[in-house]
Design a protein with these regions (language model features):
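Conserved phosphate- and dinucleotide-binding cores of soluble alpha/beta proteins
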Residues: 2-12, 27-44, 55, 61-72, ...
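Glycine-rich phosphate/diphosphate-binding loops that line cofactor/substrate pockets in enzymes
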Residues: 9-20, 168, 284-294, 565
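Glycine-rich phosphate/ribose-binding loops and adjacent secondary-structure elements
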Residues: 12, 50, 271-274, 279, ...
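Short glycine-rich or small-residue beta-strand-to-loop segments that form or flank ligand, phosphate
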Residues: 20-25, 53-56, 573
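Short, glycine-/small-residue-enriched flexible loop/hinge segments at domain edges that mediate gating
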Residues: 25, 535-543, 551-588
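Short helix-capping segments at alpha-helix termini
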Residues: 43-48, 312-314, 564
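Glycine-rich phosphate-binding "P-loop"
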Residues: 262-277, 575
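Short beta-strand/loop segment at the start of cytosolic alpha/beta domains
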Residues: 512-538
Length: 588
């Protein structure tokens, strides 16, 4: 069989002017920087290829020079169709300035669209995006006046509205893996995510296009475990061996085995967050976590929810997920966003969104840049600043419970937490609760019609989107409703009888989230069956942190036994029981 190993320059030479090029990557995870660098060099050296259309689900970039930022040269790109834009600011600026045609479509819909392109279907049929800026009745996902072609249309099936995301051919797919044999079979054992490499490869191949894959090592043909091959060689045209500096696992770390499943690391040694407004918000959002549920945490403020869950020892009761395909473990933030420490599974990105879109998330906690009196939220565009929706629309529209998390105002906000009370030291310059959001990334009206529970959590108050509108439901200790809340809103929420936010949110010690979520005190864990003369003790998820906890258990069990007045049989459930090593050493 033909040897498919080529140089980056040789791979770039097969891309033609006017091609539609799909690029893998989520931040720096799976981003083929060796290939992008080769493409950039070819264009700078000879002016070709030119007029490319770029297609990317997430934003393969670092907010600076890497990823798609390499391709922002005038003339190289004619059109870009992307899900998230915040980390490709050079390309985003060209879109905002109207220098290229540009679209922002939901990340999950682009990921799913690859399958429809591969299967030669007319497009993706989905309810995701209805009543948001992606809906053609609003903006159709178009980012500037230069962009005129409709990629999204509204159709009705059986009396129900859907959006049809138009399919188009993929001429070249630029992908990344770990190992390739000389026949082009690709494995991804050191990659933190699988992303969309397989459906994108199929989309390009069935469009009559080319598939080029960057890897970090080459193996002999036939030596790879067939069950670990994620892209079969029949789909791959060229393989490029990357330089190590262009193949980091994430843009923050060269390689971490706990991201890719080679090792597991302890999660109980992480330093707790400092007690500030971010922790208060994360704690209040964490109080909505569903024990035993599946959760998505967004980028930014919601990242703190995972840290609070770890500090409070409740991660074992949850399955945290991230949209590019990780299930379980502890999702990471910053330039590691999208991966998880100690994941239970890593699936393809489009499969994750199938699960999300069908209502698989019990709860999502997402960021909130602007909200209005209808409950609409904007996180995607602010004047000349283009962030993009990413997976926000898929996730927010379909989660069974939705929590938006963010400070009440932005731009220089300073608060103090003293004696369990909140004090505003300096108010933020920008209001976030405004008359009308600049762009509708989440439709409060649609949520009201579907009955979706939606909370807006800030450091000083909590609002909820009800059938009647936005209602103020909780106020932080130390806050005056008129002075500190209503005076900094452009709309007036419903104010009935808001209750105080839980005082434990504002205390430095752990807040006892486990007991709050489970609602199960020690007395509730002990029951007696008189007919069988058996005492049942349920220690499931119970955590003994100090000798005082041991003494508390002893007293409760002795009291129950004295009340029974005779010897009993004992059945104990220790599933998920935890005994701190220091207590074990002191006791035994």
């Amino acid at each position: 069989m033909k040897n498919k190993i080529v140089s980056a320059a040789e791979a770039a030479a097969v891309i033609r002017t006017g091609d539609t090029v799909s690029i893998s990557g989520f931040v720096g995870i799976g981003t083929p920087d060796e290939l992008l660098l080769g493409l950039e060099r070819r264009f700078l050296d000879g002016g070709e290829p030119a007029g490319l259309t770029l297609v990317f689900a997430a934003a393969p970039g670092d907010g600076g020079e890497r990823g798609l930022n390499r391709l922002a040269h005038p003339g190289l790109v004619k059109r870009a169709v992307g899900g998230h834009w915040a980390l490709v600011p050079k390309l985003a600026q060209r879109a905002v300035d109207g220098e290229i045609e540009a679209y922002n479509l939901p990340l999950g819909c682009i990921a799913q669209l690859y399958r429809d392109i591969a299967a030669k279907r007319p497009g993706l049929l989905s309810r995701v995006g209805l009543r948001t800026f992606v809906d053609p009745r609003l903006e159709g996902g178009k980012l500037n006046a230069r962009t005129t072609e409709d990629l999204v249309s509204l159709i009705e099936v059986g009396g129900t509205e859907y959006l049809l995301y138009k399919a188009f051919p993929i001429h070249v797919a630029l992908l990344r893996g770990t190992t390739a044999d000389t026949a082009g079979n690709i494995t991804m054992e050191r990659e933190a995510l699988s992303l969309d490499v397989l459906p994108a490869a199929m989309a390009a191949k069935n469009s009559g296009g080319l598939v080029i894959v960057q890897v970090e090592r080459i193996a002999q043909e036939g030596s790879l475990d067939a069950r670990r091959v994620q892209v079969p060689g029949v789909l791959v045209d060229c393989v490029v061996l990357a330089q190590p500096e262009n193949h980091w696992q994430t843009y923050a770390q060269r390689h971490n085995g706990a991201f890719s499943g080679q090792i597991r690391v302890p999660l109980d040694r992480m330093a707790p967050l400092p007690l500030d407004e971010r922790k208060v918000i994360a704690r209040r959002a964490a109080m909505e976590l569903p024990p035993g549920g599946v959760v998505n945490l967004g980028i930014g403020m919601p990242e703190g929810v995972a840290a609070v869950a770890a500090e409070e020892r409740v991660l074992s009761y949850l399955t945290l997920t991230a949209e590019p395909g990780v299930i379980g473990g502890m999702p990471q933030g910053g330039l590691n966003f999208g991966v998880s420490l100690n994941p239970d599974a890593v699936i393809q990105q489009n499969q994750q969104f199938d699960f999300y879109d069908g209502g698989g998330l019990d709860m999502a906690c997402l960021g909130m840049a602007q909200a209005d009196g209808q409950g609409n939220v904007n996180v995607s565009r602010f004047g000349k600043r283009l962030a993009g929706a990413g997976g926000f629309i898929n996730i927010s529209q379909n989660a069974r419970k939705l929590v938006f998390a963010g400070t009440f105002t932005a731009g220089g906000l300073q608060v103090a937490i003293e004696d369990g009370r909140l004090r505003i030291v300096r108010e933020g310059r920008s209001r976030k609760f405004i008359e009308a959001v600049e762009q509708v990334t989440f439709s409060g009206g649609l949520a009201g019609e579907t009955g979706q529970p939606v909370f807006y959590v800030t450091e000083r108050c909590v609002l909820r989107r009800t059938a009647e509108g936005m209602e103020l439901t909780e106020v932080a200790p130390g806050m005056d409703i008129g002075r500190d809340i209503l005076a900094h809103m452009d709309f007036r929420p419903i104010v009935r009888d808001p209750r105080p936010m839980n005082p434990r949110l504002f205390q430095p010690e752990p807040m006892g989230l486990e007991r709050w979520l489970l609602g199960l005190g020690l007395a509730d864990r002990i029951s007696y069956d008189a007919e069988r003369n058996t005492l049942f003790i349920n220690y499931e998820g119970f955590h003994v942190r100090a000798l005082d906890d041991v003494e508390m258990v002893r007293r409760e069990v002795e009291a129950r036994c004295r009340a029974i007045g005779r010897r009993v049989a004992l059945v104990v459930n220790y599933d998920g029981f935890t005994l701190d090593q220091a207590v074990s050493d002191a006791w035994f």
